[in-house]
Amino acid sequence: MSIQNFLLSAVLRWQKKSSLKLSAEHRFRRNRKWLADVRTKTKASITIQSDRIAGVPVEWVMPSELVSARQSPVCLYFHGGGFGMGGPNSHRALAAYLAEKAQIKMLMVDYCLAPEHPFPAALDDAKAVYLALISNQSESEAEADSAEIYNAPRPPRPLFIGGDSAGGNIALATLQAVRDLPPLPNLGAPPQGIFLLSPWLDLTHQNPSMLSNEKTDVMLNRQILEEFRERYAPGVPATHPRLSPLFGPVDGLPPCMIVASQAEALYDDSIKLHQKILGQGGSSTLLAWPKLPHAFPVMAGQLPEARQALDQLAHWIGQCAR
């Protein structure tokens, strides 16, 4: 365990303990504001562009030398935050690091948040952006100023899709939802890979790690997760496959990489998805790290372990993109 992880975990554990003394609403509003105020300084070699695709706000994070590269890989990414907080700004450290290491254009989706926009609003935003991207009907406002970046006969290839925590849920549910649509014309190739970082996939919260890791998870527990679920999907059965994509189909998925901490309450979500994909003949790689916080790769600006995990992810992306 790095000293950075030791210190950060101590802070997160204290924050979790103190926040549980607050009302659920107070805790949610405080954390939402904190994530909204996060500002990450990126290298001068990283270009950040705000945009809209299919009416949904997005942010491109990419190495500056790839701005005009029409065939470089693109990663459609969905941030975590319990479906109710966070945004491209809160995940910019991860996006910038992975963009540079994998030489990929990160497309960060600023999907609408609960409780103002309950289920399935976030998933609807995700599907709209994904379908627009693979059909080359992106309606990108930035294209007017930099059309040569994206305005190719087909979107830049290869395409990847990913997300952390609730964003991992959205990423997987998006692919499952799109596969159930009737055939659509003019669609490009499906993603060459999907990666999920500490994904929150089973919203019944009945997996053994929910209890066995209650003391080792420095960020989450069942109470906190159920509060997020009730804000996002009040009245929706927790077993609904679009809400809990672990219960949805996984056959036909592209190669999958899952990164998780063995200490987190959601660890079994990752294990079960990995086993389910392998059991149906698919390709899945699970990287299980000990003694790290939930969604630790997001903390690329603080943790050396986060950067090491993203280095492994970048290598995997490179292999899938060949």
Go through each PLM region and give its residues.
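A glycine/proline-hinged amphipathic helix-loop "lid/cap" segment
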Residues: 1-66, 322
